[in-house]
Regions:
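Membrane-proximal intracellular helices of multi-pass ion channels
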Residues: 1-483
């Protein structure tokens, strides 16, 4: 295990985290929020000190770096980044409990959007910015940012691929161009452009600048931290519709946008995962609109809320324009199903992913056909390409781990004594990086009702869900740390 190289990478991530806090510090200085200024200033100093110690430890690091190190490095980096990223909340006392602050920042970095805050509007502007910016950083991945922007000594394509595979969502990682660093750069350019366009559309709707920035960050990262207690409910229909469109856009595999730029429209049109994603959204909206007849005053309002909530849940953003916990049971069941499926692989969205769902169904169909015709050899194909047995094996392992973690988490947090509906939706909301659940953790409530043990379990769920389970589970394996 190349501990020194991992230490150097984590140090560089912490340096980036300290730099990310500077705009929040400037906003706090402009607002003369003394506690927030103290929180960010001390946090930056602590992070720089830890980064300095890691850099000292990592001097003369060897360049060898393999898949195991990649997984371990990603898992450790996200944990350390979260443990230090919550310091501004705690030092400023805007969130007095360190565990609550950790829950909040993990929810931010993992783009979950689950909160322990009853009064979001009570936070200072700097804290609101930092809270939302954590979504934007976590959406595409801090290590993808590192690979795209920060020069790392001794880096090569094998090295970067191990990191990209460990942090990127989906059953497989595809190169857009031959060099991995260029792929990471293209992803971030697309991400930045879409975020800026979203921000400009929000400004056009007369949304205040800071609110537009925070909302754009939350939409781009499909995170869902709002700056108002009622999330998006008090904004105009125009702003709600803008958010709906951009949530759906950020739920699409970013390679589709690259193919469109390369004028490969036919490839995008024939993409099976994209077709499933679009069909799922349209079908869900249609069924919910039918189920909500007479629930709202006008048909336009019904369609707007249905489209917004479907987009918010399927992309795992978690914004809300209405209390969907009051919807009929059938509509809530649709939303629960969308929580599980999630967005496309290669997007900023969470969940099981449409791509994985397709592979599971195709693998199931092949197994049934094998039972009927044992002598027949049939490959599983995705977009007319044969899917390797290794990818199918990893997908099945992911499904097994996915179900087991949900079962374990549900059992542990049920100790608190809340209803099965509250606990099950809380686990789904955190593990799939969605945010709001149902009942006591619905869109008008928060997660402060849970005990410290339950919050720790949900923090684990958020990290495991964002990092696609294995980088976190590998940290818990004894074999990982053996020579």
């Amino acid at each position: 295990m190349n501990y020194k190289m991992m230490g150097r990478l984590i140090a560089q991530i912490l340096l980036a985290e300290a730099a990310f806090m500077v705009p929040a510090l400037i906003i706090s200085l402009a607002g003369q929020d003394s506690q927030a200024i103290l929180g960010f200033a001390l946090s930056i100093l602590v992070i720089l000190a830890v980064a300095g110690m890691l850099m000292f430890f990592a001097r003369r690091a060897k360049k060898g770096f393999y898949a195991r190190e990649g997984m371990v490095c990603v898992g450790l980096a996200w944990i350390v980044m979260s443990l230090l990223g919550c310091l501004p909340f705690w030092i400023s006392r805007e969130i007095p409990s360190y565990l609550d602050g950790l829950f909040e920042i993990v929810s931010g970095f993992t783009t979950t959007g689950a909160s322990i805050l009853s009064n979001v509007e009570g936070l200072s502007n700097g804290m609101l910015y930092w809270r939302s910016f954590s979504h934007w950083v976590g959406g595409m991945g801090v290590l993808v940012f590192l690979l795209a922007v920060v020069p790392v000594s001794g880096r090569n394509d094998g090295f970067t691929m191990h990191l990209l595979r460990a942090e990127s969502p989906g059953p497989n990682v595809a190169k857009l161009v031959p060099r991995i660093r260029s792929t990471a750069g293209i992803l971030y350019i697309l991400y930045i452009v879409l975020t800026v366009v979203d921000f400009l559309f929000l400004l056009a709707g007369k949304m205040p600048v800071l609110e537009a920035v925070c909302t754009a960050f939350g939409t781009a990262g499909t995170g869902g931290f709002g700056v108002k207690n009622d999330s998006m409910a008090s904004y105009s229909p125009y702003i709600q519709n803008v958010c709906t469109v951009f949530m759906l856009l950020f739920g699409v595999n970013f390679s589709c946008y690259y193919l469109l730029i390369m004028k490969q429209v036919k490839s995008v049109y024939k993409d099976e995962e994209l077709r499933l994603y679009v069909g799922m959204v349209l079908g869900s909206v249609l069924l919910i609109v039918i189920n909500l007849r007479g629930f709202y005053g006008t048909f336009e309002e019904t369609v707007r809320h249905a489209f917004f909530q479907v987009a918010s849940i399927v992309t795992t953003t978690g914004f809300a324009t209405t209390d969907f916990d009051l919807w009929p049971g059938f509509s809530k069941a649709i939303l629960l199903c969308l929580m599980v499926v999630g967005a496309c692989a290669g997007s900023t969205g969470g969940g099981f992913k449409c791509g994985r769902l397709l592979l599971v169904f195709k693998s199931l169909r092949r197994n049934i056909q094998k039972m009927l015709r044992p002598q027949r050899i049939q490959a599983v194909r995705s977009n007319k390409q044969v899917v390797s047995e290794k990818v199918l094996e990893n997908t099945n392992a992911y499904l097994a781990a996915y179900v087991l973690i949900i079962m374990f988490s549900l059992l542990v947090i049920s100790i608190d004594g809340f209803s099965v509906g509250t606990n099950f939706s809380a686990v789904l909301a955190c593990f799939n990086n969605i945010g709001p659940g149902l009942e006591l953790v619905g869109p008008t409530c928060n997660f402060s009702v849970y005990s410290s043990l339950a919050k720790i379990v949900l923090i684990f769920d958020m990290l495991a869900g964002r990092l696609e389970i294995f980088p976190i589970l590998i940290l818990l394996s004894r074999d990982t740390w053996r020579r």
